[in-house]
Amino acid sequence: MKLTVGVALLGCGTIGASVAEALQHARDAIERRTGVGYELRSVAVRDPHKQRPAALERRLFTHDAYSVVEDPSVGLVVELIGGTTDAAELLERALDRGCHVVTANKDLLATQGPRLRALAGSRGAELRFEAAVGGAIPIARTLDDALAGDEILSIAGVLNGSCTSILSAMEGGATFDEATALARRLGYAEADPSNDVDGHDPAHKLALLAQLAFGLAVVSPRIRRTGIGAITQRDVARARMLGLRVRLVAAMALRERGLVAEVAPVLVAEEHEFGRTAGAENVVQIVARDAGRLVLRGSGAGAIATRSAVMGDVVSVLRGLRHRRDPIARTHHIALEPAIEIEPFFGSLARVAEIPHLRLWDDAVTSAPAAALVNA
């Protein structure tokens, strides 16, 4: 007997509409891959009468998101409305009744992820959020599956496609303001880009990765961050003359006293994985005790990258229903007393005389064992 799951979508903006169309068009292919069928039951939107993609029937739309998440015929909720207040309550209600959830809401997960993951685990539900971490790059699945039996030493990367796009444009001669305006036109930056350029977005992603890699209930406000707003065209030009590039790097590692984590613009060699990023590309470097150094790269911004990650999570949930596995809910709370803060990561990096306010990235700081890092 074929298993069929009811799916509901919260939000039908640019990304939501793209995901809704993918759910409709890829249904047969996904069923062949997973052995599980699904039916799109409802789409919650603010205005159900607004013009929507032709592939979506009018009957699917409703303005009552709460009735959607509490519908017993819905076994999987895909949340793409963003924000934290309404989204938190909606996801809590869905998870509380054992409904699986896929979300791209990094702002919510970076502050309430540990609580929501614990709730999911207690109810036997899955909470998947690949799109919230690295766009099209399968970082979460790599940590959850391929490296589940290994010990993660560190994670570092260029995790914000908007900032990479801006810095790439500045390398071509644009000012910061001109580069930011271009990123908006290309769809890589929001109308208000402060969440990206001030470093909040990659800090949110580091918090999520700390939950996945280290089982630590870290929230993003505790992570030191410096954005790219103070980077000038002169900084970028000087770096290029030295064979370097400026990139916003997010990095963290475990030490014996706790976590070291930071987001800041640093200098990277042009030939380094971080230096080879361009446009909206993201790259993440994971160092594990047995597997060594692994590098994942791909698109980190835009609707297509987000859709790819969301659909990958949908497939993962459906496969889990066919071959039932325990959801990942191992997060515990790290005791952060005043004397044991989350320390900044980049303090041990060297400086370059020509650009003294920026530090020079060194891979060596990511691969040392925890005991050695204590004395770094």
Predicted feature residues:
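General beta-strand structural signal in soluble alpha/beta enzymes
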Residues: 61-63, 70, 78-79, 102-104, ...
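Rossmann-fold NAD(P)-binding glycine/threonine-rich loop
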Residues: 81, 86-97, 104-145
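Rossmann-like NAD(P)H-binding beta-loop-alpha module
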Residues: 121-191, 196-201, 208
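Substrate-binding/catalytic subdomain of NAD(P)-dependent oxidoreductase enzymes
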Residues: 169-170, 178-283
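A conserved regulatory-domain signal marking ACT and ACT-like small-molecule sensing domains
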Residues: 309, 314-376
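N-terminal glycine-/serine-/threonine-rich beta1-alpha1-beta2 phosphate-ribose binding loop
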Residues: 1-97
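Flexible, glycine/charged-enriched surface loops at secondary-structure junctions
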Residues: 37, 196, 217-223, 248, ...
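Glycine-rich phosphate/pyrophosphate-binding beta-alpha loops
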Residues: 293-294, 298-304
